[in-house]
Amino acid sequence: MEIIARIHTDLPTKFGLPRQSGLVEELEGLVVFEPKYREPEALRGIEGFSHLWLIWEFSEAKRDSWSPTVRPPRLGGNKRMGVFATRSPFRPNPIGLSCVKLLGVVKTADQGLALRVGGADLMDGTPILDIKPYLPLADCRPEATGGFAAEKAGYSVKVDFPAELLEKVPESKRTALKALLAQDPRPAYQNDPERVYGFGYAGLEVRFRVSGDRLEVIEVEET
């Protein structure tokens, strides 16, 4: 299986990533194709679709062996579920699936046509294995149930972002950052209100702590 593209986002590490695609639609990414796959003809007709499926590789989660059970973050990291009942990266084949919004096909200076997308849950440089259109007729299932994952649907925290710190963030990046923080990036099993967490975003290091349902940004620095 070949890598056909890589996505470039403002998140250089796993920490801070949305837990699923579509949760932070404001988070943009650019899918840049490998030289072999930069044929404009390969994208003919793609503008007619509002959303795409990205099939990608968990490049940071490769292991020599696999376990039939994993600890889903949504269950606090303490309860085991079958690997095929989860979207854990620790799988026999480390392949991920994300539904993203197609914001446009753009022409780059030296890398051919690229796809501008919104709502990706991928770190910068993630390898893309395939791209397919989202088909509402086939892919939307209104009667579907979400198992244990439905228990945490809609969870968010209130974000306190002091104005003097927010000013350090480029204006075009603020909305997505606040939306990311509202998703509470902490591991689900950590709830120490005094602990300081941090993650990289758009060339910045953002540090925060969480108490109850309130997240407070305490530092923003250039990396």
How would you name each of these model-derived features?
Residues 1-95, 107-116, 120-223:
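Mixed-charge, low-complexity intrinsically disordered regions
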Residues 8, 100-103:
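Conserved positions in beta-strands of structured domains
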